[in-house]
Amino acid sequence: MGFTPSYKVGVEFINEPYRSVIQGLRNALISVWGDNLVSLVVFGSVARGDARRDSDVDLLIVGKQLPKSRFKRLELFEEVEKLVEPLVEGLWSQGYYIDFTPIILDVEEARRHRPIYLDMVVDAVIVFDRDDFFRKVLDELSSRLLALGAERKRVGKLWYWVLKKDYRPGEVIEI
């Protein structure tokens, strides 16, 4: 059966009330990070459109001139998060318990194909993407997966990937 690359580009593909807070987050990132913001990508249940009221918002943020420390990167994100706190608190008062779960990578780190990208080729929403950086990463990965004959198999509400149909034990598959 295979898979069809079907990630989307544009915040309009995110359902409310998440869309408003993600637009606010995008604007805050642009304001604080400026030209150092490369990409903002939403993935997971919010991107798929099946988020619950208590779902976290999974984010991939790609930036330039980031500190090496993961904790320092999170501090940079917290600076941005403070700017959207009123939006988040407003949603909490409406019964939407939103928390952000960011993965923050520099450009070189983001270029390397990561297992988390597998599902992104199918259901991510790219909200901001300077010079189509992350779109190119996902297109490259999609091409590789299609060349391998990869399949995303569904079992009830869950799924898994078969990267190569004729896989032999011990064989290394590079994506």
What are these regions (language model features)?
Residues 1-36, 47-54, 64-175:
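Catalytic core of pol beta-like nucleotidyltransferases
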Residues 59-63:
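Short beta-strand->loop micro-motif that forms the acidic, two-metal-ion catalytic signature
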Residues 36-42:
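Short, glycine- and small/hydrophobic-rich beta-strand elements in well-ordered beta-sheets
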Residues 44, 58:
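Conserved G/P- and acidic residue-centered "switch" motifs that form tight phosphate/ATP-binding loops
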